[in-house]
Structure formats: structure tokens, C-alpha cells
Curated annotation (Swiss-Prot):
NCBIfam families reported for this sequence: aden_deam, PRK09358.1-1
Family statement: Belongs to the metallo-dependent hydrolases superfamily. Adenosine and AMP deaminases family. Adenosine deaminase subfamily.
Pfam families reported in the protein's UniProt record: A_deaminase (PF00962)
Binding residues annotated for Zn(2+), in chain numbering: 12, 14, 198, 279
HAMAP family noted in UniProt: A_deaminase (MF_00540)
Protein name as it appears in the record: Adenosine deaminase
Needed cofactors: Zn(2+)
Catalytic activity: adenosine + H2O + H(+) = inosine + NH4(+); 2'-deoxyadenosine + H2O + H(+) = 2'-deoxyinosine + NH4(+)
Co-factor binding comment: Binds 1 zinc ion per subunit.
Amino acids binding substrate: 14, 16, 171, 280
Keywords carried by this UniProt record: Hydrolase, Metal-binding, Nucleotide metabolism, Zinc
């Protein structure tokens, strides 16, 4: 399912949604944190999707366990380091790992900027051990915690802007619309960082218009509701706004009721720039190759179409043209 001449990338991949079950177990015991199970085997269903669960509430509960064990900055560093290893072991040539320092910090009141530094340090350690994979970082503002929390989060992220390639807005799209964050994204644009926004997942197409036209997003996370607005679909295709599509996650969170309803095919047929991603691979219990198999076996995509999706990911990456060429050269 994977074309070995094209770099394999994962652009929408939450670092804080990819914590190993073993790591949750070990950090929980190390720091005296009460876990919901008394063995590694019985812990897995509390932190990973088993079978065909499709509940947003269940998904988010599993996600929360991944940050509940981040009791100190060493734990944060370990998780970041292991994320690089997991990316390399899954066969990725390039990944953009995104993380919310506030979400990672809040359970144990860690310093936000300290979390950012620990993630950067952990990723650098991981890259020394796994030089075959290239990694960039995207900082997230978690809107679910409110405007002030996002200000603190952005301050911590922009203090290390030279170690990031973009800023994202994630969380409660309905309760905290993007319009609340216009000032935040003016700062992001002034910093020169790229912008990607979770939109059109819980809210409708208007959320995507707002993310693009007001916040300055050049990529959209999920974007499943775009298909409800033909003018938006035309705009996405014309302006090469990239859609970071995450089919398994969308199914597991009930964003779509079935893969037959997933808009990936509609995006492709409309000429929209779209690629496949894992979202929270630790929770979903998947890797990037799983998404390509799914697209082929259950969504009817041909090998040629999968190769185009794979190449789209390279085109959409927040990297320079010379870095893009280097990724391709390494596959020759």
C-alpha cells in the first residue's frame, strides 16, 4: 500500500496522544499515581481503543490518561523521546509532532515553558538514536481551557519559536470558536510561523472559513464538514489549502458514523489537497500504514490514488523546498 519511492509522512500526529501503555504503567508506579487497572494487560483497554469502539467520551478519557502520568519534566522528555522512536519504527520518513503544553502541564502544575523545553529536548534525544526519521514540532493552543490559558500557552511556545514550524488551535470547537483567538493568531503570523487549525470537526464549514480567512490557516485538521459547502470545497482546491485527514480517528470519535460517510473520497474527487494521518496513534492503536490499508481495503482507493495521497503529504509539509527534495532524494 505504500509507495517506496515517495517519502512517508504523518503531519497530524499528537505527541500527547501517543504515550505507550508500558510508559503509562511505569510512570504511574514511579510517581504513585493511581491507575485504573492492576496490570499492564488490564490497563490497555483504559488507554487504547479496543476493537470498534466509537465514542468521543471514551476516546477523550483514554487521551486524558496519557497526560495524567506526566508528573515531572523528565516524564515529558521521555514521552517526547519515545514519540520519535515510534515514528521511526512505524516507517515514517518525516513527521510533524504536535503538542499542547498546557494540556501536558495541567495535571501536575508543571511550568508551561518547561514542558515546551522538555519536549524539544526529548525529541532531540530521540533523533540522535533514530536519525533516519526527520521531525518537526507544532505547538497547540488548547481552546477548551479558555482564552487566558491559550495566551499562557502561546507565550511558552513563542519563547521557542525557532524550534517550531507551526501553531495549531485544538479542543472544543463549538464552545470556543476561532473568533476568540484572532489576537493570538496575529501574534503567530507576526512570528512567521505556519498555521494549521482543527476545524470542521465538531463545528460546521463556517469554522473552516473563519480559520482560513481570519486566523490565516493554510492547513486544516480534519475538515470533515467542508463537504457541506460547495463554495468552500472550490476555495480549498483553488488555494491549495491542505486537509489533514484522519479516517480512523474520525470513526472512533463518531465524527463520522461510518467510513462510507467519510469525506476523503469527496476531497480527492474535488481536487482538494488532502493527506492521510494518524491523529492520536497511541489512543487509536494504529500506525500510518494502517490508514493506507484502510483507505485501500475499506474505502476503495487504488494504489495510484494512495501514491497521490502520500505525495500530497510531502507537498503539505511545513518544510522548505530543499528539505522536500532531500526527502525524495533519500528514497531514490
Amino acid at each position: 500500500m505504500i509507495d517506496n519511492k515517495i517519502p512517508l509522512v504523518d503531519l497530524h500526529r499528537h505527541l500527547d496522544g501517543n504515550v505507550r501503555v508500558q510508559t503509562i504503567w511505569e510512570l504511574g508506579h514511579q510517581h504513585g499515581i493511581a491507575l485504573p487497572a492492576d496490570s499492564l494487560e488490564t490497563l490497555a483497554p483504559f488507554v487504547q481503543i479496543q476493537g470498534k469502539e466509537t465514542s468521543l467520551v471514551a476516546f477523550l478519557k483514554k487521551l486524558d490518561w496519557m497526560v495524567a502520568v506526566l508528573a515531572d519534566l523528565d516524564a515529558v522528555q521521555r514521552v517526547a523521546r519515545e514519540n520519535v522512536a515510534d515514528a521511526a519504527l512505524s516507517g515514517l520518513d518525516y513527521a510533524e509532532l504536535r503538542f499542547s503544553p498546557y494540556y501536558m502541564a495541567m495535571n501536575h502544575k508543571l511550568p508551561i515553558e518547561g514542558v515546551v523545553e522538555a519536549v524539544i529536548d526529548g525529541v532531540n534525544q530521540g533523533l540522535k538514536a533514530h536519525p533516519q526519521v526527520k521531525i518537526n514540532l507544532i505547538g497547540i493552543m488548547s481552546r477548551s481551557f479558555g482564552v487566558d490559558a491559550c495566551t499562557a500557552e502561546l507565550n511558552g511556545l513563542l519563547a521557542h519559536r525557532d524550534k517550531l514550524v507551526a501553531i495549531d488551535l485544538a479542543g472544543d470547537e463549538l464552545g470556543f470558536p476561532g473568533s476568540l483567538f484572532n489576537d493570538h493568531f496575529k501574534r503567530v503570523r507576526d512570528s512567521g510561523l505556519n498555521i494549521t487549525v482543527h476545524a470542521g470537526e465538531a463545528a460546521g464549514a463556517e469554522s473552516m472559513w473563519q480559520a482560513i480567512q481570519e486566523l490565516g490557516a493554510t492547513r486544516i485538521g480534519h475538515g470533515v464538514k467542508a463537504v457541506q459547502d460547495p463554495k468552500l470545497m472550490e476555495y480549498l482546491a483553488k488555494h491549495r489549502i491542505g486537509i489533514e485527514s484522519c479516517p480512523t480517528s474520525n470513526l472512533q470519535t463518531s465524527t463520522v458514523k461510518s467510513l462510507a460517510e467519510h469525506p476523503l473520497r469527496t476531497f480527492v474527487d474535488a481536487g482538494v489537497l488532502v493527506c492521510l494521518n494518524t491523529d492520536d496513534p497511541g489512543v487509536s492503536n494504529i500506525d500510518i500504514k494502517h490508514e493506507y490499508r484502510l483507505a485501500h481495503n475499506e474505502m476503495g482507493f487504488s494504489a495510484a490514488e494512495l501514491a497521490k495521497l502520500q505525495a500530497n503529504g510531502v507537498e503539505m509539509a511545513f518544510i522548505s523546498d530543499s528539505d522536500r527534495k532531500a526527502l525524495y532524494a533519500a528514497k531514490a
